[in-house]
Amino acid sequence: MSLIATRFAPSPTGYLHIGGLRTAIFNYLFARANQGKFFLRIEDTDLSRNSIEAANAIIEAFKWVGLEYDGEILYQSKRFEIYKECIQKLLNEDKAYYCYMSKDELDALREKQKVRKETPRYDNRYRDFKGTPPKGIEPVVRIKIPQNELICFNDGIKGEVRVNTNELDDFIIARSDGTPTYNFVVTIDDALMGITDVIRGDDHLSNTPKQIVLYKALNFKIPNFFHVPMILNEEGQKLSKRHGATNVMDYQEMGYLKEALINFLARLGWSYRDKEIFSMQELLELFDPKDLNSSPSCFSWHKLNWLNAHYLKTQSTQELLKLLKPFNFSDLSHLNPTQLDRLFDALKERSQTLKELALKIDEVLIAPIEYEEKVLKKLDQVLVTPLLEKFKLELNQADFNDENALENAIHKIIEEEKIKVGSFMQPLRLALLGKGGGIGLKEVLFILGKTESIKRIEKFLKN
């Protein structure tokens, strides 16, 4: 059995989106699981549409999610001489030919075919041309497709695909300026790179018969194909930017962890029993492209957030501090290591993303400027004021290094005053955080410390 070799081959005409990353992950997993090779190829032959920023963004996205490719990145724009040699070889062997049909002639032909309700296609008029070429026309090069032959391949997801060559026209492999076309360069590079398995979106399925024609014409070995169904939104429509089809790096800015995103995308179109959470090692052990679903998968923000929340909970304090560096939040330098641990232990249980975690840090560490109106209205000032004044005295005596002592101080007020828990907890929470919800009060007191806790209570009483 030959060494497995896969590739991911994006065009740098736009940023890497979520569907592209999923394809890259599938190729990466299959290669690495079989101790094979995984290559990154930048398909930049369309010089008019290429973007250096887009190419760099693809590489940046790979670095972020940790998809390591083998060897150097292959840029198609640096391989034009190789493509020219292959085109000339096909011309020399009478497997391709120059076509002098002008754009106007081709447009006129297509109009006639539309009127006759025929499929618009080239009519092979220059296929066996031996005469004098017309002046003023820069020819394209077309492949000479064998007539009335059956192209048959077994797609790893779609099953057997059969196409008669009569359904194909002699498509262009080199434009009039000499630049090669997409299907041609893809075939050349996949063959010369030794790609054994092509895993790509099923929007490429219609290209496959054309590429097989080229593989055969050039005596190249045909790889295995797996055409993955697209990702749909939750309404069953094509994924749009609003529903997740956005730049991969936007997910980092939104506070998603790479582990969660990889897990999420690997599960979009692939499954293993009822298991939802997979480490990279588990994915490498279990993934097989033959298990990919033949029907489209649905993007779910709810599922992504659920997975991200899971992975967020597994991060240590030091790991979270590193991950939070790109986000703006309150200074933490005044907190000791134990306070930091309590802050993150409490908040990561209530956060789905790093961005949300950063906001919740501010909610605890920034003293409230105003207080939640609907909670404030429910409080009886006559009862609340003496309770908080008495609690201040308890806090002055409490050991703020002992969370149990802080909890005891809270319950002492409740027991001595013979009041309901909520009757004291609500005003205390409002004084400390400015709102009616949040993490446990003993944690808040421990994290804020004695001076800040008392300061916030005094400020609340003044208001």
Swiss-Prot record:
One of its GO terms (molecular function) is zinc ion binding. It comes from Helicobacter acinonychis (strain Sheeba). It comes from the Bacteria. It is an enzyme of class 6 (ligase). Belongs to the class-I aminoacyl-tRNA synthetase family. Glutamate--tRNA ligase type 1 subfamily. This is Glutamate--tRNA ligase 2. A motif ('HIGH' region) lies at residues 10-20. One of its GO terms (cellular component) is cytosol. The lineage of its organism: Bacteria, Pseudomonadati, Campylobacterota, Epsilonproteobacteria, Campylobacterales. GO terms for biological process: glutamyl-tRNA aminoacylation.
